[in-house]
Structure formats: C-alpha cells, structure tokens
C-alpha cells in the first residue's frame, strides 16, 4: 500500500520560481476521449452499416496494475507538473501515517 501526503516540497520549473517550493498533490485522471479525434472518426465511419466488428478488440491483457501518476501544482506560481510512481495495487492520498507498534488495519 502506497500512502502519499497531499503536499510535498519539490523543485518548481516555473519561470517565477525555479527553486524548491510547496506543491499540492493530486492523482492524475485521464480525460474523456474526444469524438472528433481523427482515429475515432475513421473508426466510427468504418463501423457504420452491416459487416459487424471491423477491427480487433484486444483481449490478451497482461498487466494487473497501472502506474500511479501524481499531478503536482506549485502553490506560488500554479505551474503544474506530473510525476509517475511505481506500480501498486493500493494507492492512498493523504492517509494516516504509520505508527510503530500498531496492529495492521484494512
């Protein structure tokens, strides 16, 4: 289980900063796919009418996890950066810190 704090002091590449500043951490989430991207328009046109499925649907999935991507926003200049972490099954943002000698809780 990976537990990441909601703020982190790290280097900012923004023109005003270019030094270590406080950053607000959120988890990256993919945006909604556009209906007007060239590949989607081509695919929709190919799918029209009779003839069933025209392109293969991928079934041989190999990975069981995705890499976690953090979105870092500078508190000073609002510049955003992304940082990818290793793969993990359980990810937590701003959870309680671990304490020595405590029993495991799920």
From Swiss-Prot:
GO terms for cellular component: ribonucleoprotein complex; ribosome. SUPFAM superfamilies: Zn-binding ribosomal proteins. Keywords: Antibiotic resistance, Cycloheximide resistance, Ribonucleoprotein, Ribosomal protein. Pfam families: Ribosomal_L44. The keyword Ribosomal protein applies. The keyword Ribonucleoprotein applies. It comes from the Eukaryota. GO terms for biological process: response to antibiotic; response to cycloheximide; translation. GO terms for molecular function: structural constituent of ribosome. Belongs to the eukaryotic ribosomal protein eL42 family. PANTHER family: 60S RIBOSOMAL PROTEIN L36A/L44. Confers resistance to cycloheximide, an inhibitor of polypeptide elongation. This is Large ribosomal subunit protein eL42.
């Amino acid at each position: 289980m990976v537990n990441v704090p909601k703020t982190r002091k790290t280097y900012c590449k923004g023109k005003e900063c270019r030094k270590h500043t406080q950053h607000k951490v959120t988890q990256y989430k993919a945006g909604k796919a556009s209906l007007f991207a060239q590949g989607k328009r081509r695919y929709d046109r190919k799918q029209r009418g009779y003839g069933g499925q025209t392109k293969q649907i991928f079934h041989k999935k190999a990975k069981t996890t995705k890499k976690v991507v953090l979105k870092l926003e500078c508190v000073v200049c609002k510049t955003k950066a992304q940082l990818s972490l290793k793969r993990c099954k359980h990810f937590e943002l701003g959870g309680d810190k671990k304490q020595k000698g405590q029993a495991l809780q799920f």
